């Protein structure tokens, strides 16, 4: 499988896992009768997503050196920032967006190696 596709899949699964963990944390605002059941459901989805991401990560490490693959995971910061705005209405400051732009620039620089 293409290294770029594997990296994208790892990042997407990791992002989904993070969003599910956030959702599980917000379940504690629910009435006590529903809280535990909802939290466990979201945590189970998070564990599955993060577990699949880890398996694909191991496959990616067979194709790329760790010194190249690991910095590319910075794409997770970009995805999580966008998803947090989309799904949770979280706001990012100009400084935050400049950091995201720097991460994207770094990923582009690193991708020339691939």
Curated annotation (Swiss-Prot):
Pfam families: EamA (PF00892). The keyword Transmembrane helix applies. Gene3D superfamilies: 1.10.3730.20. The chain crosses the membrane at residues 38-58, 64-84, 94-114. GO terms for molecular function: carbohydrate derivative transmembrane transporter activity. It is found in: Cell inner membrane. It is a multi-pass membrane protein. Its main location: membrane. Residues 43-112 form the EamA domain. Pathway: Bacterial outer membrane biogenesis; lipopolysaccharide biosynthesis. The keyword Transmembrane helix applies. GO terms for biological process: lipid A biosynthetic process; lipopolysaccharide biosynthetic process. One of its GO terms (cellular component) is plasma membrane. Keywords: Cell inner membrane, Cell membrane, Lipid A biosynthesis, Lipid biosynthesis, Lipid metabolism, Lipopolysaccharide biosynthesis, Membrane, Transmembrane, Transmembrane helix, Transport. Induction: Activated by low magnesium concentrations, via the two-component regulatory system PhoP/PhoQ. Belongs to the ArnE family. Heterodimer of ArnE and ArnF. Translocates 4-amino-4-deoxy-L-arabinose-phosphoundecaprenol (alpha-L-Ara4N-phosphoundecaprenol) from the cytoplasmic to the periplasmic side of the inner membrane. This is Probable 4-amino-4-deoxy-L-arabinose-phosphoundecaprenol flippase subunit ArnE. It comes from Yersinia pseudotuberculosis serotype I (strain IP32953). The lineage of its organism: Bacteria, Pseudomonadati, Pseudomonadota, Gammaproteobacteria, Enterobacterales.
């Amino acid at each position: 499988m293409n290294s770029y596709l594997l990296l994208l899949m790892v990042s997407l699964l990791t992002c989904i896992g993070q969003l599910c963990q956030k959702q599980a944390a917000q379940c504690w605002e629910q009435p006590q009768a529903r809280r535990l059941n909802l939290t466990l459901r979201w945590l189970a989805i998070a564990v599955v997503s993060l577990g699949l991401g880890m398996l694909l990560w191991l496959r990616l490490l067979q194709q790329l050196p760790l010194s190249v693959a690991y910095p590319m995971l910075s794409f997770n910061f970009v995805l999580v920032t966008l998803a947090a705005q989309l799904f949770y209405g979280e706001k990012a400051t100009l400084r935050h967006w400049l950091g995201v732009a720097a991460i994207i620039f770094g990923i582009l620089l690193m991708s020339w190696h691939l």
